[in-house]
A protein has these predicted regions:
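Generic start-of-chain signal for non-secretory N-termini
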Residues: 1-11
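A structural micro-motif at secondary-structure boundaries
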Residues: 10-31
């Protein structure tokens, strides 16, 4: 008699599919145990780690026996009719703990990694077109049913390192997809994914930088500029910081690409680059004449204000032109 296939999903809420039905573990600890074994993707999880995840620093004396009961319940959920104490096919005793016997066909996390790794391999060898890389990465990202692995579990469980590490795999793949789409000249292929990711985590600067660049490349120049302004305000309000170098560079790229590059401040010329380090050297007191530091700092502030004003005017012209052109097709 053929065994019924079982599929596990953790890229979003934890799900199990068997024979067209979706049996749900009844107890929160059973769901947490199944999720922990799934995010470890076929690797054994020691009993001590399971105890720590389920109870933290104050486990009951009966913790190991409770885990064994949870394992038995999960085994019968996955394989109805399984005799008591039988190991079954999926939840295996292994290396002083337990292992979920899964592969890329039965677990969405492993399937995501398989497709993502194939895309990265093709991108690294340079022989495949960027468009193919984009297609594979968007296929992999499409397996996620939300921004977080094992969504719905208690936060104290999801804060564990194994869950957080898997959470980081999604934005990393999305950054790769955005970069490949920009190289391929197909920004629209990832735009909705980037918009959703920015809504899920509005302070993720690397993703915001790619959203700004992708919006502009897709013809949404005004939205790219307004996205940067909103991000800058949010970072200041929520974190008390200015945009980092990557996000600032993305914004500057959009302004330059608009054809209205900010002009150099008055007096700046071929020698401006050579003097760029002067304020820092003057403040450090290395080789500067007395009083030179004040003059250098004043000159630097004047230059910064001039550049900021010129960039603001260039940005306004870029936004006006984008709005006049109307939305991209």
């Amino acid at each position: 008699m053929a065994l019924e296939p079982v599929r596990f999903a953790v890229l979003g809420p934890v799900r199990v599919e068997r024979a067209g039905a979706e049996p749900v573990p009844g107890r929160p600890q059973e769901r947490a145990l199944l999720a922990l074994l799934a995010v470890r993707a076929g690797q054994p999880v020691a009993l001590a780690e399971i105890v720590d995840v389920l109870w933290g620093r104050r486990p009951p004396d009966s913790a190991v026996n409770v885990i064994r009961r949870h394992v038995g319940t999960l085994r019968r959920l996955l394989e109805p009719g399984l005799p008591n104490r039988a190991a079954g096919r999926w939840l295996i005793r292994d290396a002083g703990g337990y292992r979920l016997a899964v592969d890329a066909d039965s677990l969405d996390l492993l399937r995501f990694r398989r497709v993502r790794d194939e895309a990265r391999r093709l991108g690294a060898d340079g022989r495949e077109s960027p468009g193919r890389v984009v297609a594979l990465l968007t296929e992999a990202l499409g397996l996620w049913r939300g921004p977080h692995v094992a969504a719905g579990l208690p936060e104290e469980v999801r804060e564990r390192a194994g869950f957080r590490a898997v959470d980081r795999e999604r934005p990393a793949a999305l950054r790769d997809a955005a970069d490949a789409a920009l190289r391929a000249g197909t920004p629209a292929a990832v735009l909705s994914l980037l918009r959703q990711a920015a809504a899920d985590d509005p302070c993720d600067e690397p993703l915001l930088a790619r959203l700004v660049l992708t919006l502009a490349a897709a013809g949404h120049e005004a939205e790219a500029l307004s996205t940067y302004r909103a991000a800058r305000a949010r970072l200041a309000d929520e974190l008390g910081i200015d945009p980092g170098a990557e996000l600032r560079a993305a914004h500057a790229t959009v302004v330059r690409a608009s054809g209205t590059t900010a002009p150099a401040p008055s007096g700046a010329g071929a020698g401006a680059g050579a003097g760029a380090g002067a304020p820092a050297e003057a403040e450090a007191g290395t080789g500067a004449e007395p009083g030179a530091g004040t003059g250098a700092r004043t000159k630097a502030r004047t230059k910064a204000r001039a550049e900021a004003g010129a960039e603001a005017r260039a940005e306004a012209r870029a936004e006006a032109r984008a709005e006049a052109d109307g939305p991209a097709a």
